[in-house]
């Protein structure tokens, strides 16, 4: 720890800066998508768990939705099960889905729960199948080349999209001071399980809960402009325009769309933040500068003094 970090005056200054944010967001729900480097580096893992506990202690209700793609890939490799991808999505047959459930609903989920509990919180691990929280349907993937007269439907197995989020279980746990930790596995009316993109699940959970914030932890600093600077304080109209003119493209586009749709669906603000920064969630919520890209149509969300 640096000498500055030990300076009591600096500690008081930080707490003073955080106070209006704590007052404003107390009693609100914040949905956090946890993944990337923040999930694999020991220092970041510990800081994330402490962030969730601190949020709960100051009256904010965090809800965690996590990924686990690398961990799924590792176990599939150990079991000599080939991984195939179509459009960046894992082709998930019945055998692969069993592994997905074991990893997401078991290994990864309970590891996060344990970390939060060891940091002084009360976390409960769930999948979307518990309490039928996440009703899913199979995702239809279309492929078409210029030579084709019509697109073909590609069957990628047990990969789904969200049809409905039931919030009663999440709300009950949050009201009893628990921190829900949700694996992105959904179920359809026939009881079939589906692996769903964790960003999309987090966005839909945030919409269903009427959350104050959706926070997507990533391995980048945020949405960058042509000069390499992080853009923030963006409206949905601005983001739509940047998607339309090609300013936003490539790997960031799916996350931006997820964040955008959440705000359009009633979430006060979405944040794409740098999960490589220790305590990124607290820095984004409780400081004036933040550590990522904020998307909101609520002018006062940029600063509590506005």
Swiss-Prot record:
The record marks 33, 255 as: Transition state stabilizer. Pathway: Amino-acid biosynthesis; L-arginine biosynthesis; N(2)-acetyl-L-ornithine from L-glutamate: step 2/4. This is Acetylglutamate kinase. InterPro entries: AceGlu_kinase-like_sf (IPR036393), AcgluKinase_fam (IPR004662), ArgB (IPR037528), Asp/Glu/Uridylate_kinase (IPR001048), NAGK-C (IPR041727). GO terms for molecular function: acetylglutamate kinase activity; ATP binding. Keywords: Amino-acid biosynthesis, Arginine biosynthesis, ATP-binding, Cytoplasm, Kinase, Nucleotide-binding, Transferase. The lineage of its organism: Bacteria, Pseudomonadati, Pseudomonadota, Gammaproteobacteria, Oceanospirillales. Pfam families: AA_kinase. Gene3D superfamilies: Acetylglutamate kinase-like. It catalyses: N-acetyl-L-glutamate + ATP = N-acetyl-L-glutamyl 5-phosphate + ADP. It comes from Chromohalobacter salexigens (strain ATCC BAA-138 / DSM 3043 / CIP 106854 / NCIMB 13768 / 1H11). GO terms for biological process: arginine biosynthetic process via ornithine; L-arginine biosynthetic process. Substrate binds at residues 68-69, 90, 195. The keyword 4Fe-4S does not apply. CDD domains: AAK_NAGK-C. Its EC number is 2.7.2.8. GO terms for cellular component: cytoplasm. Catalyzes the ATP-dependent phosphorylation of N-acetyl-L-glutamate.
């Amino acid at each position: 720890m640096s000498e500055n970090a030990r300076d009591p005056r600096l500690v008081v200054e930080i707490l003073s800066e955080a106070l209006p944010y704590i007052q404003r967001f107390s009693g609100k729900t914040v949905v956090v998508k946890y993944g990337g480097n923040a999930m694999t580096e020991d220092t970041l893992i510990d800081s994330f768990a402490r962030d969730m506990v601190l949020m709960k202690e100051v009256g904010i209700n965090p809800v965690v939705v996590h990924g686990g793609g690398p961990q799924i890939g590792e176990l599939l490799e150990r079991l000599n099960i080939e991984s195939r991808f179509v459009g960046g999505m894992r082709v998930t047959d019945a055998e692969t889905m069993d592994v997905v459930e074991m990893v997401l609903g078991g290994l990864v989920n309970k590891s996060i729960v344990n970390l939060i509990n060891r940091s002084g919180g009360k976390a409960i691990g769930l999948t979307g199948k518990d309490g039928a929280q996440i009703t899913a349907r199979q995702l239809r993937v279309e492929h078409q080349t210029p030579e084709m007269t019509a697109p073909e439907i590609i069957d990628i197995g047990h990969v789904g999209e969200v049809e409905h989020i039931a919030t009663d279980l999440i709300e009950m746990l949050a009201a009893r001071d628990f921190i829900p930790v949700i694996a992105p596995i959904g179920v359809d009316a026939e009881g079939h399980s589906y692996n769903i993109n964790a960003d999309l699940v987090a966005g839909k959970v945030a919409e269903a809960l009427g959350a104050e914030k959706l926070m997507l932890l990533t391995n980048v600093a945020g949405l960058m402009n042509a000069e390499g600077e992080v853009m923030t304080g963006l409206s949905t109209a601005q983001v739509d325009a940047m998607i339309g003119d090609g300013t936003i493209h490539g790997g960031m586009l799916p996350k931006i769309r997820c964040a955008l749709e959440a705000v359009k669906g009633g979430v006060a603000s979405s944040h794409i933040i740098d999960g490589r920064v220790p305590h990124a969630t607290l820095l984004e919520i409780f400081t004036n500068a933040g550590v990522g890209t904020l998307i909101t149509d609520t002018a006062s969300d940029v600063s509590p003094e506005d």
